[in-house]
């Protein structure tokens, strides 16, 4: 599918009521359709990306760091507004779907897409199938524990991988702030390029913070590899600006758990911008459903 129209809004999500969130979603799509010149009635499928946990059916946003509200029926809102079937997916799952379609030779059967940005998340493919939880979208890699009782995470708990590897966590450590410093809201802008520049210029605290992020990521991967064996990794987002500093710590953390394999054989590839992958993932999700409907109609 080709992009025919776009619409965006800057919102302080933490201040929004459920009705505000609903109005923003519906309004954005209506505005995009108005700009396109096409009638809303031509919509066939809607795919929504979210940062957070959805129900396994892909209808409800159960939890997200961007809002205090829970159990938001995003699919129902869009379905009622546009009379179109709607799915809701975790953003990292969508990135994994996009990579699977964009580079099928590299990302075909078993791999993980790990976002390193305002948060840390994972989309996981095993044997050609996206992995989710029993009841939720699951695979919350960023909220696996790295250091019990450690640094404060945006989720409110302590010691999560995200509390060391997200942009706010690296900035906190690079500034020498206490580990219990409250993380900023996801909408707050963090100039990660500045942190990268400091580290590349030799700033000791910035380098140490980035290396600790690498250890957190590598330790989390160790746990996964112990369960299902090693797989390819795609690191996505602005955190990849410092991959050259982070990589050694990641591979060092992996060294003791790869079951005798060579850690340098584990393919790690970087993508600096997550937004195009999320958009592709949404398009793929919607188009795959339409393909199935067309195929089923042809069989009948």
Protein language model regions, located:
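Phosphate-binding/catalytic loop of phosphoryl-transfer enzymes
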Residues: 42-49, 53-169, 287-300
